[in-house]
Swiss-Prot record:
It comes from the Eukaryota. Transmembrane segments: none annotated. The lineage of its organism: Eukaryota, Metazoa, Chordata, Craniata, Vertebrata. Expressed by the skin glands. It comes from Rana arvalis. GO terms for biological process: defense response to bacterium. This is Ranatuerin-2AVa.
Amino acid sequence: GLLDVVKGAAKNLLASALDKLKCKVTGC
């Protein structure tokens, strides 16, 4: 349902944010 879509989007945003942060810290 809609909640699943929202959860999926939030998870994707969190994952990409963590990736960017990791790139800043470790230099990818």
